[in-house]
């Protein structure tokens, strides 16, 4: 049925082009030979001009001033961005390729993990296995997103109202908003966590679990039912109050996509920060970054605490902070995102 419909559409388009060509030719001819035209000439001219515009300008994937998905703006971006990659794990796309599964298992060197397929099957008996309808992009839209990091450069930035003006506000790990609203805003739609970085969330916030091991998926099951898991490599919350329908799972294959395509294999695996940035490229039309990088004095610390050792992660080799920062810098230079550097 679909091929027949496609052929009919193609045939109709061909006839339309032929009609415009013949009519334009006739009118040009009649202008020199006949004093009156059988058809309103202005109407055909306008139709012809509109058709030319349609053929000249490529389809824009959104109605924003900047559209992330727009192709042929940057070869660097086009080589990395893969629209077909699905950021969230669902019951329908839960199968992992063998190489992806083996790579993912090595991230935190989990010993004797339980069967992943069985774990995922049990997981989606507890939480919904479909994609968050809020994340599904409309055919034509302008979805503006703020990705808010944890950098101390947010202190006294007064970005709060600007951040809250976005359609989606994505935060990560232990970042609080209470008491810091003037600088970081009060709105949160989605919050990225893993078990060891979990913090209590407001009822309306969707939790996006970033799983780095099978135990992380098992923790979601446990934390919403029996509470049997209270320790991974550090203590973790045994129970969480997040509504089950508000729990989403970051796809392990998407983590590998970020590592392979965007980080080119730098570091051992991507940080939550860069994972949230690339995630946003796939669900948003415009992306603004806040709270990424060091402050103006070169200090790496969180906006909610005075922690001199906050930048120690840069020396562990787990994440390549410099390479990740370079990726966001290039994205900003080609107008795919904007970076607000604070103070």
UniProtKB/Swiss-Prot annotation:
EC number(s) per entry: 2.4.3.4, 2.4.3.2
GO biological process, any: ganglioside biosynthetic process via lactosylceramide
Protein name: CMP-N-acetylneuraminate-beta-galactosamide-alpha-2,3-sialyltransferase 1
Expression sites by tissue: The long isoform is abundant in salivary gland, liver, lung, and colon mucosa. Both long and short forms are detected in submaxillary salivary glands.
Spans through the membrane: 12-27
Predominant cellular place of this UniProt entry's protein: Golgi
Superkingdom in the source lineage: Eukaryota
Reaction it catalyzes: a beta-D-galactosyl-(1->3)-N-acetyl-alpha-D-galactosaminyl derivative + CMP-N-acetyl-beta-neuraminate = an N-acetyl-alpha-neuraminyl-(2->3)-beta-D-galactosyl-(1->3)-N-acetyl-alpha-D-galactosaminyl derivative + CMP + H(+); a ganglioside GM1 (d18:1(4E)) + CMP-N-acetyl-beta-neuraminate = a ganglioside GD1a (d18:1(4E)) + CMP + H(+); ganglioside GM1 (d18:1(4E)/18:0) + CMP-N-acetyl-beta-neuraminate = ganglioside GD1a (18:1(4E)/18:0) + CMP + H(+); a ganglioside GA1 (d18:1(4E)) + CMP-N-acetyl-beta-neuraminate = a ganglioside GM1b (d18:1(4E)) + CMP + H(+)
Metabolic or biological pathway: Protein modification; protein glycosylation; Glycolipid biosynthesis
Enzyme class: transferase
Any one GO MF annotation of this record: beta-D-galactosyl-(1->3)-N-acetyl-beta-D-galactosaminide alpha-2,3- sialyltransferase
A Pfam family annotated for this UniProt entry: Glyco_transf_29
Ranges of the Lumenal topological domain: 28-343
InterPro entries given in the database record: Beta-gal_alpha2-3_sialyltrans, Glyco_trans_29, GT29-like_sf, Sialyl_trans
Function comment: A beta-galactoside alpha2->3 sialyltransferase involved in terminal sialylation of glycoproteins and glycolipids. Catalyzes the transfer of sialic acid (N-acetyl-neuraminic acid; Neu5Ac) from the nucleotide sugar donor CMP-Neu5Ac onto acceptor Galbeta-(1->3)-GalNAc-terminated glycoconjugates through an alpha2-3 linkage. Adds sialic acid to the core 1 O-glycan, Galbeta-(1->3)-GalNAc-O-Ser/Thr, which is a major structure of mucin-type O-glycans.
Alphabetized UniProt keyword annotations: Disulfide bond, Glycoprotein, Glycosyltransferase, Golgi apparatus, Lipid metabolism, Membrane, Secreted, Signal-anchor, Transferase, Transmembrane, Transmembrane helix
Membrane topology annotation: Single-pass type II membrane protein
Signal peptide extent: none
Positions annotated as glycosylated: 28, 82, 117, 326
Organism: Sus scrofa (Pig)
Reported modifications of this chain: The soluble form derives from the membrane form by proteolytic processing.
Coiled coil start-end: none
Disulfide bridge map: 62-67, 64-142, 145-284
Topology feature Cytoplasmic, residues: 1-11
Protein localization: Golgi apparatus, Golgi stack membrane; Golgi apparatus, trans-Golgi network membrane; Secreted
UniProt family annotation: Belongs to the glycosyltransferase 29 family.
Residue sites binding substrate per the record: 108, 150, 173, 233, 269, 273, 293, 302, 319
